[in-house]
Curated annotation (Swiss-Prot):
UniProt biased composition (Basic and acidic residues): 206-222
CC per GO annotation: cytosol; mRNA cleavage and polyadenylation specificity factor complex; nucleus
Assembly behavior: Interacts with FIR1. Component of the cleavage and polyadenylation factor (CPF) complex, which is composed of PTI1, SYC1, SSU72, GLC7, MPE1, REF2, PFS2, PTA1, YSH1/BRR5, SWD2, CFT2/YDH1, YTH1, CFT1/YHH1, FIP1 and PAP1. Component of the APT complex, which is a subcomplex of CPF, and is composed of PTI1, SYC1, SSU72, GLC7, REF2, PTA1 and SWD2.
GO molecular function: chromatin binding; RNA binding
Further facts: Present with 7450 molecules/cell in log phase SD medium.
Domain of life of the organism encoding this protein: Eukaryota
Gene: REF2
Comp. bias intervals (Low complexity): 242-252, 321-338
Organism placement in taxonomy: Eukaryota, Fungi, Dikarya, Ascomycota, Saccharomycotina
Name this protein carries in UniProt: RNA end formation protein 2
Amino acid sequence: MSAPVPQLVNISHALQASTIQQIRLDMVDFNKDCKLSSIQLARIDKYIDSLQAALNQFTKDNLHIERKEKNVTEADIQLYSGLKSMYLDYLNQLIKLKHEKQHHSTPPIANDVSLDFFVNQLPKFSPEERKNYIDNLILNKNSHNRLSKMDGLVDAVINLCVLDTSVAENVRSYMKLLDTLGFQKGSNSTGTKANLKKKLASSKAKIKDSEKEKEKEKDKSKVKMKTKLKPSPLLNNDDKNSSPSPTASTSSMKKLKSGLFNKNEAKSTESLPTSSKKKLSFSKYLNKDDADMTKLGTKRSIDVDFKVNPEASTVASNIISSSTSGSSTTTVATPASSEEPLKKKTKISVQDSNVQSILRNGKPKKARISSIKFLDDSQLIKVYGDDLPNQGLQVSPTQLKKILKPFKEGEPKEIILFEDMSIKLKPLDLMFLKNTNSDDYMDISETKGGPIHCETRTPLIYRKNFNHFNPDLNKRPPREPIEFDLNGNTNSTPTIAKAFGKNSLLLRKDRGGLPYKHVPIVKRNKYPPRPVH
């Protein structure tokens, strides 16, 4: 007979099973923590309120079960009392947990209500502890008179607001304390608010200033990394910048335009600072159709480009272009005596150590990588492990590499780390095969070059790799078995072959006639017919 089912219990306002499970899990977590945060305490309050509301509504909905009216069974009473006791049990546990943890979460000097504690001690606590302390002060009405008479309390609370600017809950608690003490209601309310605004603005300004200083430091570091390129005075002489320059530079430019280079004038031009940049002539890359450019003499040979100083060549080309654009009738002719100072100037420019060549060499530059190397000390490392001495084994770094990664091609997989090994392996003794019957050892085995001699009539391709078998082998009729030479000495060595398939001990017909153990064929004895009586 089945148990009666409760039918008159109203559970429309009862808590869901998922909510009860969540409360149970959170209570386990709350018991593990020594201190509870404000979020955890708020969650406990929420659970207490929901359980209290659910319990009150559940009792109202089931008053007929409380009165034990007609048609109320024992199953209904049992379910109602069980749910009610569960709600009460959870309520008592949560209230007790909140009382214990809230007592532990308060600061150790919770009873201290002095201005010195507000100014010096309270900022040292964590934000949660400060909030709990202030909340306890708000609830403790006996200390309100003493706090309202303190002169520097407002400034201390404002400093706490500035300290916990990012925590909104703490700021609300601080403002609530000032409100309960009456600092924001009387004539002092405007002063406290203005002071608080100033402090908060100054704290935000300090944060912004610190961020700006960090950005400036980053910009300075970036500027230091950039290389400053100084332009050449001969090439970058504009009309605006030419007026404040000295007369010596203008006269040298005029003499360069006229093309009259003397030895004394060459010495004066050598004193001018040469630019760190070099320019190459790309005349060798011009097309053959540019015949008019060759007539003007701007196209130079490759030998001149690499022998003559490129700065002087570019200056000369600029002078020729400017003179031709200025007057079409005038022509420029450089005398033969101008070649000597040019050669001297190129020699000096080549010898100058500040000038860096931009010509690429054919050989690529290899970056040197300096690796850290240590001395090979045999007493450096001590290794502990299985099959090693109890006092450990001292090895060098190279031996340690060998231990950690011993498998390399062409090297043995096992190395003897020390001479006095506690475990000595015994050599394999195969003499028992000669003493016992060899038929007992004819079985399927895998020996790749092992000590047992393998004699089988299976081709080598099938012994090494069984993927060459036809998948339709088991569908065909079995072939004729291989005949053994029984007169020969075939049983002196075991016949070893590899079976295939899911089962390693298949029948001969399923193996396609491959032998792995010689089974003698038992023929039926031909007895004389039984006499009929």
